[in-house]
């Protein structure tokens, strides 16, 4: 198809520059008004009012046309709900370019290049991969021992809305939260032991890690961290009495017990299993 030189120049100029730029928030309902291209382009300013009705606006058929609709009078609307997360990538300007053909009667006048910036809204809260995790710390673990916990992900694409701040919901004397950034910008979370644990005093701790994004208003989620204290064999068996005094007759039946010992051990599992034997200092007669 042949075009006059002035049309070719106009097309070339259009490819190099943006004529109009508009902004609209994502998730607006289909049919949301965006702008009046006819008024903003000022193309009708030099046309007599009686002839302005002859000027029409239409959109060049491209893939992006499915998102927007332009009326003959130059009004721009959305044709469907726009989701920034599905249309664009993280921390990049989310925009689409449409080209509007302006005609007077049937003759070609100009092509306008319109840029529509889709603004990310804070419609996603940070999400942990799980609602709850279980960590194990031992009684023998020293101060500074760390255990990793999963980080949260925010699906919003703007830096502010996807920025996540972490903290423990309540301060704890035994544990703290360490947050550092990896080379890829992802946060690395660790639960840090602040003081030696004693399972016999407390065998379980419940912590809540809060992930809060930078949106306004902000959104947040909670990761429940259950910390189970593993037993260490740090308690000896204890007899109910430090000394047992008994008397037996010489005629006592050897098959019958002369004493029942009571022993307890504060440890659990195999650490609390008790066996009995005579001390090497016990005389053979007593045995």
Regions found by a protein language model. Give the residues of each.
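Extracellular cadherin-type adhesion modules in metazoan precursor proteins
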Residues: 1-287
């Amino acid at each position: 198809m042949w075009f006059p030189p002035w049309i070719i120049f106009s097309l070339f100029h259009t490819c190099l520059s943006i004529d109009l730029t508009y902004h609209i928030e994502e998730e607006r309902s289909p049919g949301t008004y965006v702008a009046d291209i006819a008024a903003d382009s000022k193309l009708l300013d030099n046309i007599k009012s009686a002839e302005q009705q002859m000027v029409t606006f239409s959109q060049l058929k491209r893939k992006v046309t499915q998102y927007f609709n332009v009326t003959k009078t130059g009004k721009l609307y959305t044709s469907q709900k726009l989701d920034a997360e599905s249309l664009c990538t993280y921390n990049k300007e989310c925009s689409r370019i449409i080209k509007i053909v302006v005609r007077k009667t049937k003759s070609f006048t100009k092509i306008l290049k319109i840029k529509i910036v889709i603004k990310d809204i804070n419609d996603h809260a940070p999400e942990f991969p799980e609602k709850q995790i279980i960590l194990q710390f031992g009684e023998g673990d020293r101060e500074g021992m760390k255990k990793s916990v999963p980080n949260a992900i925010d699906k919003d694409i703007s830096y502010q809305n996807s920025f996540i701040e972490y903290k423990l919901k309540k301060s704890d004397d035994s544990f703290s939260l360490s947050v550092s950034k990896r080379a890829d910008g992802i946060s690395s979370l660790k639960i840090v032991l602040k003081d030696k644990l004693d399972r016999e005093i407390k065998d379980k701790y419940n912590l809540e890690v809060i992930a809060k994004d930078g949106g306004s208003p902000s959104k947040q989620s909670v990761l429940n961290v259950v910390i189970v204290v593993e037993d260490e064999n740090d308690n000896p068996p204890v007899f109910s009495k430090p000394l047992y005094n008994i008397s037996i007759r010489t005629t006592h039946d050897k098959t019958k017990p002369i004493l029942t010992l009571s022993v307890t051990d504060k440890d659990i599992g195999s650490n609390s299993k008790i066996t009995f034997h005579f001390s090497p200092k016990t005389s053979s007669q007593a045995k």
